[in-house]
Regions:
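Conserved anion-binding
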Residues: 11, 15, 27-28, 37-124
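Catalytic cores of alpha/beta
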Residues: 26-34, 72-84, 129-147
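Charged helix-capping and loop-helix junction motifs
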Residues: 1-6, 101-108, 163-164
Length: 171
């Protein structure tokens, strides 16, 4: 939570992208922003008013992300695409690491990328969940430009983190 972000903030200049899978999310935005988060990603289902939550994040001069669960349709956030810095597409159901990638989200990524290009918008398309060596390229080819790959980075090749990151960068 915020104490961890605050403790680590002075140790690195790398951006902290926090994905708040909590409800009601508006109760926590201020704490994460003040702790040093750079990007705050929220679920539309976790706020009574998505626009107010976006405005609150912006009031702290932070970047805004909206996360879509595997079953959440893109059209729920279409009116907000020009107000965000990233859309995070979950390719597993939130809750725990190590789940299998849900391949149906590839079509959602493609649709979001097409919508982004059609409207000439500027936001990152991030994908989180089940990202591994075998699906990494297909996720990029579908239109994602930010990928979260926790389990693969820490567990493949006997946990050789550098080797795993280097391999993913080479794809």
């Amino acid at each position: 939570g915020p104490p961890v972000i605050k403790a680590l903030r002075s140790k690195t200049s790398l951006p902290f992208d926090v994905h708040l899978m909590i409800s009601p999310v508006h109760k926590y935005i201020k704490d994460f922003a003040n702790a040093g988060a750079d990007i705050i990603t929220i679920h539309p289902e976790a706020t009574p008013n998505l626009q107010e939550s976006i405005d609150e994040i912006r009031s702290f001069k932070k970047k805004v992300g909206i996360s879509l669960n595997p079953d959440t349709k893109i059209d729920i956030v279409e009116d907000y695409l020009d107000k965000v810095d990233l859309i995070l597409i979950m390719s597993v159901y939130p809750g725990f690491g190590g789940q299998k990638f849900i391949s149906d989200v590839l079509e959602k990524i493609k649709s979001l990328k097409n919508l982004k290009d059609k409207k000439k918008l500027n936001f990152d398309i991030e994908v989180d969940g089940g990202i591994n060596f075998s699906n990494f390229k297909s996720v990029i080819d579908a239109g994602a430009n930010v990928l979260v790959s926790g389990t693969t980075i820490f567990k493949e090749n006997n946990g050789d983190i550098k080797k795993n990151i280097d391999f993913l960068k080479s794809i």
